[in-house]
Amino acid sequence: MQNDPIGLMDSGVGGLTVLKEVQRLLPTENTVFLGDQARLPYGPRSVAEVTMFTKQIAQFLRQQARIKALVIACNTATAAALTTMQQTLPIPVIGVIAPGAQAAVQTTRNHRIGVIATAGTVKSDQYRRDILAAAPNSQIFSVACPEMVTLAEQNDLTTTHAQSVVAANLASLMDKKIDTLVMGCTHFPLLRSAIQHAVGSQVTLVDPGLATAEQTVAILKTRGLLNSATTRGTAQFFTTGETDQFDTLASQWLDQQPTPAKHVAIAQLTTPMEVN
């Protein structure tokens, strides 16, 4: 089981930002990633629907690759489905919100923290609850930024148009005197430059992907699941969307040249499968 891959899932390509950190911290681990681009965005969908999608993807990854752990590299899916998945799967399941919230608490100096995310993540209130549980004196300002997900998926990251959209989405945070901003959607680190420009250098950006990768290391070590290999691990990619679009962004973002993604039809996810 130690040689089995770590599974990662997202609504699109944003979860590659988490995969990048996992590969950096665990270079010998095998990984398999599925981006559900055909059903993007998850943000406006109901908790029940996002949970169903998450279950389908987990089942697919377990059937295809016998994953030893699942990283829900999507804030919306973490908010909706993490507890359910942890209760139903016989493998470790790691989400991105708790690690991101803890990183924000450790980063802030004035305890005024901004959170940018999808509508679903903001509505769940999970970041606010997790931050306040660790630091009750914090003030949290949350903003839903669905247009920024679209920018990332379209690989529109550094244009004047992208900067304008980001600035408009973050405008309501400008008078809140935050010193820390959580990028509470795994797509948003792709827009780091535009986000930093919009909020100014006095605001520290928190990427939950790094903290999530660190938690993944700790959990695998505790469970005795770390791969003992000394060679670089393999990486498989699946998408329910256009493979060319996925491959372009994956090759730009990841440190190593990725293998081409394989297309997965939605019917393959919705058809019941046997999982050993």
UniProtKB/Swiss-Prot annotation:
- Record's keyword annotation contains Transferase: no
Where does the record locate the signal sequence feature? none
Q: Which reaction does it catalyse?
A: L-glutamate = D-glutamate
Pfam assignment, any one: Asp_Glu_race
Catalytic center residues: C74, C185
- The EC number(s) attached to this protein equal 5.1.1.3
Instruction: Report the pathway entry.
Output: Cell wall biogenesis; peptidoglycan biosynthesis
- UniProt keyword annotations, A-Z: Cell shape, Cell wall biogenesis/degradation, Isomerase, Peptidoglycan synthesis
Q: Which terms does the record give in the GO molecular function aspect? A: glutamate racemase activity
Q: Which GO terms describe its biological process?
A: cell wall organization; peptidoglycan biosynthetic process; regulation of cell shape
Q: What Gene3D superfamilies does its record include?
A: 3.40.50.1860
Write out the similarity annotation: Belongs to the aspartate/glutamate racemases family.
Q: What does this protein do?
A: Provides the (R)-glutamate required for cell wall biosynthesis.
The entry's protein name is: Glutamate racemase
Q: What is the originating organism of this protein? A: Levilactobacillus brevis (Lactobacillus brevis)
